[in-house]
Amino acid sequence: MKSYEVNFDGLVGPTHNYGGLSYGNVASQSNSQQGSNPREAARQGLAKMKALADMGFKQGVLAPQERPDVAALRRLGFSGSDAEVIQRAAADAMPLLVASCSASSMWVANAATVSPSADTADGRVHFTAANLNCKYHRSIEHPTTSRVLGAMFNNEKHFAHHPALPAVAQFGDEGAANHTRFCSAYGEAGVEFFVYGRSAFDSRYPAPQKYPARQTLEASQAVARLHGLSDDGVVYAQQNPAVIDQGVFHNDVISVGNGEVLFYHEDAFLETDAVLGQLRAKLASKGGNFQAICVPRAAVTVEDAVRSYLFNSQLLSRDDGSMLLVVPEECRNNERVWAYLGQLTSQGGPVNEVKIFDLKQSMQNGGGPACLRLRVALKETELAAVNQGVIMTASLYDTLLQWVDRHYRDRLGEADLADPQLLVECRTALDELTQILKLGSVYPFQRQP
């Protein structure tokens, strides 16, 4: 049976703004308080989805969340009508309103961790929504994320959904941004690679000193248990604390893997040789031939990697065995990174083409091509069981472009977040979107009695 990797990209929401909310994320911090363009941001994301679909890659779309999150503000003590809640939050606690308006759910690499059916004990595709408890503005996402994923993958025969892990620091879980999978074919058993920043319960593990390590070993282990993964199909690795302190807040900022290939920076991991040895041996036991492409620090510094988002790229496998690397425009603008990519594609290795996308609106908030997508490996029968309303087609692309142009503002600043009309605009847009994508009532405002 045929099998595919399907990339489900996050659709940028109507409240996309530069709130500077993500400590440890260099771009998010440095672009704080700039004016944003939600319409352009959504269009840039859709353009990438359409281009990859046109190239023959399986592509889907993941809906944004209702923002501002009025219910979250009510839990923090603001009362009155929805408009009054927003106005009172703006007057008394603007940072809380900014957080409640974040469109960060666009970075769906953090939405969940996904294990394909070939790896799991019960032969179903497993999803665990990420609790994202390190940052308040992201910690409020997972209830809606779970409902949206449930509406997309709504077939108990093929799909199993788990709620987020306990929302405490010991089980900090950032989803697929710290997870990748190696395999000889998407429908065959593979090796799942979990990368963590610290251990919550074992002080022998080192930890970063400046920025927080958002993923714990214990969270990764819990997800592997929930998904019914076998020990011979899992490798755990600790991310180098020194690179976390340089702005590598998720592993997908310093490495990317797909198929049998890991593309990584020399400084990405602790005990790199041992990690690569485990990956090589475990993949070999499943009939795969692991290939590691190391980018030396002499060619690309960690600072260059963070500024260009070289590793926050999409590594895509073609049917002929060659690979395409999808990178942001910022890679071409970095002389050392661009020189390295020229060498990479001319060496005769698996990566023989680089494709550039303008994702500036997302990049300025610290999210590149890899942040914007959630990968789901599916067999043909499983793909047929997915809600077909979320699969990207030329028709859906045109419909979504028109939807964006109708509902999204072309400029948004902090002061605009206090406008109650923005909530009305967002709910109107999302109500229409659920009909376009055939999701049903997944948003809180649609579920109120």
Swiss-Prot record:
The active site is at E174, H250, C371. Substrate binds at residues 19-28, 110, 137-138, 214, 252, 365. Pathway: Amino-acid degradation; L-arginine degradation via AST pathway; L-glutamate and succinate from L-arginine: step 2/5. It catalyses: N(2)-succinyl-L-arginine + 2 H2O + 2 H(+) = N(2)-succinyl-L-ornithine + 2 NH4(+) + CO2. Keywords: Arginine metabolism, Hydrolase. One of its GO terms (biological process) is arginine catabolic process to glutamate. Signal peptide: none annotated. Residues 23-43 are annotated as: Disordered. Pfam families: AstB (PF04996). One of its GO terms (molecular function) is N-succinylarginine dihydrolase activity. The keyword Magnesium does not apply. Residues 25-37 have a biased composition (Polar residues). Its EC number is 3.5.3.23. InterPro entries: AstB_sf, SuccinylArg_d-Hdrlase_AstB. It is an enzyme of class 3 (hydrolase). Belongs to the succinylarginine dihydrolase family. Homodimer. Catalyzes the hydrolysis of N(2)-succinylarginine into N(2)-succinylornithine, ammonia and CO(2). This is N-succinylarginine dihydrolase.
